[in-house]
A protein has these predicted regions:
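Short, positively charged and aromatic/hydrophobic N-terminal segments
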Residues: 24, 31-34, 38-42
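Active-site-facing substrate-recognition patch
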Residues: 43-111
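PRPP-dependent phosphoribosyltransferase catalytic core
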Residues: 44-59, 182-255
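Short glycine-rich phosphate-binding loop at a beta-alpha junction
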Residues: 111-120, 195
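Conserved acidic residues
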Residues: 114, 162, 192
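Short, glycine/charge-rich flexible loops or terminal/linker lids adjacent to PRPP-binding catalytic cores
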Residues: 127-165, 173-179
Length: 255
């Protein structure tokens, strides 16, 4: 067991404070590293908005939780949750709240962007609404270039060296987002950040975005959704554990 000692030091305001030392590693250093780690991992800018958005998405059935009767994704994964945020466009109050929160957080996190880009097809509608709220140009990015006409992958006018904030409706593995970002960069855009309505917080997505140095935030995410669902008794605590197990290894999970 390492010995514990106490030292004194003076802070920036001239106050004397005690610093506990374990061997050569100070507790204050451990605390600093922990805070930095938590900050890096956090993709939620406003916890209140995160819960509110999750609540709204559940109320309009954009998010469905079925731990006992799982859905099947296009990838073949079995999932106790299904999320279709495009439904929000059919509810004026909900889409207005989402649009306004996107605009506030974009201005807070990214300053003044030049262009808003939506990832097709799910984020075309909400992306255009956000661009309207911010009075900015809008473009959207297809998964791949069209095979006819002008053969565009990016629809709309995008000049070189524009500061672009990318909008997604939903982030799972991150592949579609990064494909869109790649196309935007190849067109000369500078990516300021990526924002989504909802993020599953899969580890594979975090690794991919970190590798590409993409600044990512979401209005809501899986963790806030589960917390809200438990608080409002939408699910039992035992079902919440099933949801957490699925998120930890969605490709291996079995109901």
């Amino acid at each position: 067991m390492q010995s514990k000692t106490s030292e004194k030091e003076t802070d920036s305001k001239g106050r004397t404070t005690a610093v506990e030392v374990f061997g050569i590693l100070e507790v204050k250093t451990i605390h600093f590293v922990l805070i930095k780690t938590l900050y890096f991992c956090s993709m939620i800018h406003d916890p209140y908005t995160a819960k509110k958005v999750a609540e709204l998405l559940i109320q309009i059935n954009a998010i469905k939780l079925e731990p006992k009767n799982p859905f099947t994704w296009a990838s073949g994964w079995k999932s106790p949750i299904y999320c279709d945020n495009r439904i929000a466009l059919s509810y004026p109050t909900v889409r207005t709240f989402i649009r306004e929160q996107f605009a506030k957080q974009i201005e807070s996190l990214h300053g003044r962007a030049d262009v808003i880009a939506g990832v097709a097809t799910g984020a075309i509608g909400i992306g255009a609404l956000v661009a309207e709220e911010l009075n900015l140009p809008f473009v959207y990015v297809r998964p791949k270039a069209k095979g006819h006409g002008r053969k565009n992958q990016i629809e709309g006018l995008l000049e070189s060296n524009r500061q672009v904030v990318v909008i997604e409706d939903l982030i799972s593995t991150g592949k579609s987002s990064l494909d869109a970002i790649k196309a935007l960069k190849e067109a000369g855009a500078e990516i300021t950040g990526l924002m989504s309505i909802f993020d599953y917080n899969f580890s594979i997505a975090k690794k991919r975005f970190k590798k590409e140095n993409i600044n990512i935030h979401s209005l809501s995410d899986y963790d806030h959704l589960i917390e809200l669902a438990i608080e409002n008794r939408f699910i039992l605590k035992s079902e919440a554990e099933v949801l957490r197990q699925w998120r930890a290894a969605p490709n291996k999970w079995k109901p």
